[in-house]
Every structure is written in C-alpha cells, then in structure tokens.
From Swiss-Prot:
Residues 1-21 form the signal peptide. It is found in: Periplasm. The gene is tolB. The Tol-Pal system is composed of five core proteins: the inner membrane proteins TolA, TolQ and TolR, the periplasmic protein TolB and the outer membrane protein Pal. They form a network linking the inner and outer membranes and the peptidoglycan layer. It comes from Klebsiella pneumoniae (strain 342). One of its GO terms (biological process) is cell division. SUPFAM superfamilies: TolB, N-terminal domain, Tricorn protease N-terminal domain. Keywords: Cell cycle, Cell division, Periplasm, Signal. This is Tol-Pal system protein TolB. It holds the Pfam family TolB_N. Belongs to the TolB family. Part of the Tol-Pal system, which plays a role in outer membrane invagination during cell division and is important for maintaining outer membrane integrity. TolB occupies a key intermediary position in the Tol-Pal system because it communicates directly with both membrane-embedded components, Pal in the outer membrane and TolA in the inner membrane. HAMAP family: TolB.
Length: 430
C-alpha cells in the first residue's frame, strides 16, 4: 500500500506548484435520512497535536457520498480507540449498526502509521468487518484517510469508493498577467495545485482514463486549440487547431481515442482522433450543431448535444456510422451529458420552466430526476463510481463548484477563495 500511495501521487507532485488558496466543501443540504454510522476520532500516538484529523476526514467522505449520516461527535456514546473497545449495545441503541475506529502513530523515521477498523454493532455485534493499515509520510495522511473511507464505503455498500480521486477545473481570477488557471485538487478541494496558467481563456478539461493526462481548450495562439498535457512532466501535445471552433474533448474509456467538436466546415460536428496514429475521422455531418461528446463504456458510442430538432437535446451515435438516436425527451432542452462508467445512467444540464439544473436520466428505463437546486447550473461531471456529481453554477457575479449525490440527498458548495471556478472534471480512479 505504501508503494501504491507513492505511485498515485508522486508523479503529480514532482512538478506541480501547490497553491494555498484552496476550495473547501460547505454543506448546503445534509443527509438526515441516510444510513447512520459512527466514526470515532482516531487515537493519536505521538508528540504534540495530531498532524491531521483522520477520523474527521473519513466522516466527511462518508457524508459527502450522500449514503451515510455520521453521528455528530458530541453525541458519540463512547470513544473507543480500538475494535476491542467498541461496545455494540451502546451504538445499536442509537440505530447505528457500524462503527469506524482507528489509530495514527508517529514512527521514529518521521513517517506515520494509519490504521482503521470497521466494527459491526448490529447483525454480528463486535465483528471486525474490515481493517487496514498504511505507512505514509505527512503529506499523504489525507490520502490514507481517503483510502480508509474507500474501504469502509465499499464494504458497506458494495460500491467501489471514489474518495482518492481528483477534480480538474478552471479558475478565472480578477486581473494579473495570467488570470486563467487550470488546477487540480483532491475531490474535496484539498491539495490543490496548478497545471497551467494563461493570459487567454482555458476551457473544457477532460481526464485520460489512466489519470495521467488532461485534454483542454486554450486560446493562447489567438484562436481555439485542443491540447493534451501530461501531468508528470508538463509536456503538451497539440491535437487540433483548425479555423473557427475546436472544443469539447473527451477521452474514450479504453484510452485509444479522443472525441471533440470542430466547426471547420461551418456547423459544429463531432470528430474522433486515433491517438496512436493521429488520424481524425468525422462522426456527424449536417447543418445542425453537434457538440459535447461523452463516451459510452464500449468506446464505440457517444452521447452528444445536437440542435437538429430545433433546441439542444442529447443523442446517441456510433462512431463507425449510423443515424443518431435521440435519448432525451423531458424538459425544453437537455445538453452537456456525462455517461456513467457502467452506461446505465447519465447526468446532464436540463432546462424546464425557465430553470436550468443538473438532472440524472436512467438510460434503461428513461426516468429523469432533477438533482440540483442552484442557479444556472452547467458542466456536470460524474465520479467514477457514479455516486456523486460535481458541477458549476452562478453565484452573485461569479461561478462556483457544487457537489450533489446522485440520489439528490446531499448537496455542498466548494467556494473558491481567489476567483471564479468553472468547468469541473472528475478524474478516474487513481
């Protein structure tokens, strides 16, 4: 695990400039109806104060998923420091059937040992359901906490946790030589660092499926251009810089292709590049505007936005040819879809009754659920496990990032401290 921790973040931290003006989650709608769980402050064994509140990070992760409602620390019936000290009856009396305990120990070499145990207090009282231990340096303590959260989440839900993922987003600052910045942070806004800064707009970041690259749009040459940047060394590869519009990049799940929109022939149309050969082929062709591609898991089909019926709606097309099929019918218009990793659902920007919100559509049954309640919501991006969505919305004269669980129960805001934040993109598993 120690090696995995180093590999996952080492390549990012080699060159990136860490920023101090970070975004932070502010809860706007809680999860009182979610499954209650106990998360006890982790025992600290070392000099002075604990370097991180690991237990607090685990509790926040579980709350952010929308599936759990951690008991407030002031209401904990006991504060056990190990699985053996957990008294199941004290917790089950509060309706809690699982408790997380843990320990953080300072090692002589300056590293830390982070251990956790998930204890059953319901069905099989006192049974340890999951446990783990990680040896990490100080800078990876939050990552170790997220690793514990992932394990607990998966054990209790059967769904792989996505708390060790990251988000990319664009920040527009007021003034300065380089007011546009592409940044990456942990999913919860911590450990933010700079990927690229520019005097001209940056747009539409998109992750490669292995998390090693970001595609995005830049206007630094005087017109739009699509580029792919390798995070480990900052190397930039230009993909497209045709006359007029070059935008909306999306890597295929198998990593072999990049879809994007070009208007070099007049109307916006979809194209796909084979990243190995560099060959580009046109997917859609017509007078309508076709843009915002999102891949289905087979790497052969795309969801995309088209105005061929008059107003923007989401369609599906095979990249090898065929007639696009419309897949959204509710509301006045739907656009900017993001298809889940299993291909069963998608999130999108849906407009109805003068409101523009983030909605989720079941691609098998067709049902639509509005998830957000903020203002002028746009650019939704799903977590790789499909349980959370990050998106941008308008607030005052600027824009901020928001988080909502895909069941709509948990909502939070990630306010920036030094500029407008937009165009979020959730990373794959790292």
């Amino acid at each position: 695990m120690k090696q995995a921790l180093r590999v996952a973040f080492g390549f990012l931290m080699l060159w990136a400039a860490v920023l101090h003006a970070e975004v932070r989650i502010e809860i706007t709608q809680g999860v009182d109806s979610a499954r209650p769980i106990g998360v006890v402050p982790f025992q600290w064994a070392g000099q002075g104060a604990a370097p991180e509140d690991v237990g607090g990070i685990v509790a926040a992760d579980l709350r952010n998923s929308g599936k759990f409602n951690p008991l407030d620390r002031s209401r904990l019936p006991q504060q056990p420091t190990s699985a053996q000290e957990v008294q199941p009856a004290a917790w089950s009396a509060l309706g809690i059937d699982a408790v997380v305990v843990g320990q953080v120990t300072s090692n002589p070499d300056g590293s830390y040992q982070v251990a956790y145990q998930l204890v059953d207090t319901g069905g099989a009282p006192g049974t340890t359901l999951a446990q783990g231990s990680f040896k990490v340096t100080k800078q990876y303590l939050r990552y170790a906490a997220h690793a514990a959260s992932d394990a607990v989440f998966e054990k209790l839900t059967g769904i792989k946790g996505a708390f060790r993922t990251r988000i990319a987003y664009v920040v527009q600052k007021n003034g300065g030589q380089f007011p546009y910045e592409l940044r990456v942070s942990d999913y919860d806004g911590y450990n933010q660092f700079l990927v690229h800064r520019s005097s001209q707009p940056l747009m539409s970041p998109a992750w490669s499926p292995d998390g090693s690259k970001l595609a995005y749009v830049t206007f630094e040459s005087g017109r739009s251009a699509l580029v792919v940047q390798t995070l480990a060394n900052g190397a930039v590869r230009q993909i497209a810089s045709f006359p007029q519009h070059n935008g909306a990049p999306a890597f295929s799940p198998d990593g072999s292709k990049l879809a994007f929109a070009l208007s070099k022939t007049g109307s916006l149309n979809l194209y796909v590049m084979d990243l190995g050969s560099g060959q580009i082929r046109q997917v859609t062709n017509g007078r309508s505007n076709n843009t915002e591609p999102s891949w289905f898991p087979d790497s052969q089909n795309l969801a995309f936005t088209s105005d061929q019926a008059g107003r923007p709606q989401v369609y599906k097309v095979n990249i090898n040819g065929g007639t696009p099929q419309r897949i959204t019918w509710e509301g006045s218009q739907n656009q900017d879809a993001d298809v889940s990793a299993d291909g069963k659902t998608m999130v999108m920007v849906s407009s109805a009754g003068g409101q523009q919100h983030i909605a989720k559509q079941d691609l098998e049954a067709g049902g639509v659920q509005v998830l957000s309640s903020t203002f002028l919501d746009e650019t939704p991006s799903l977590a790789p496990n499909g349980t959370m969505v990050i998106y941008s919305s308008s607030q005052g004269m600027g824009s901020v990032l928001n988080l909502v669980s895909t069941d709509g129960r948990f909502k939070a805001r990630l306010p920036a401290t030094d500029g407008q934040v937009k165009s979020p993109a959730w990373s794959p598993y790292l």
